Amino acid sequence: MRMSLAQRVLLTWLFTLLFLIMLVLKLDEKAPWNWFLIFIPVWIFDTILLVMLIVKMAGRCKSGFDPRHGSHNIKKKAWYLIAMLLKLAFCLALCAKLEQFTTMNLSYVFIPLWALLAGALTELGYNVFFVRD
């Protein structure tokens, strides 16, 4: 399951464009859709990314894999998996708040996003200041 760079870029643009069109229609009150329906392109894109990531992580379980090459690679892929799950949690909490399924405080909705941003800043700082190849 390997995608070329052009395919990934095209897929990203397609799902982003579809999501933004649906979002504009919802915000202009032209479409009376549920917020969960608005986020379907985002979730389809995230599902594709999660499947690709899990396949790459499962490739490490092959019998011919040499663990000396890329031991830090599994940590990076685990961070990507955690980041995707945090993004999914934020999207679900945001949709639940916008649909008024819950009376959760808005600051609680943003906790997964804040954790994701803090982790991204930590990884960026680590890659800038501590990784020297």
Curated annotation (Swiss-Prot):
The keyword Heme does not apply. Its main location: membrane. It is found in: Membrane. The chain crosses the membrane at residues 5-25, 35-55, 78-98, 110-130. Keywords: Membrane, Transmembrane, Transmembrane helix. InterPro entries: TM_Fragile-X-F-assoc (IPR019396). GO terms for cellular component: membrane. It comes from the Eukaryota. Pfam families: Tmemb_185A. It is a multi-pass membrane protein. PANTHER family: FAM11A, B PROTEIN, TRANSMEMBRANE PROTEIN 60. This is Transmembrane protein 60. The lineage of its organism: Eukaryota, Metazoa, Chordata, Craniata, Vertebrata. The gene is Tmem60.
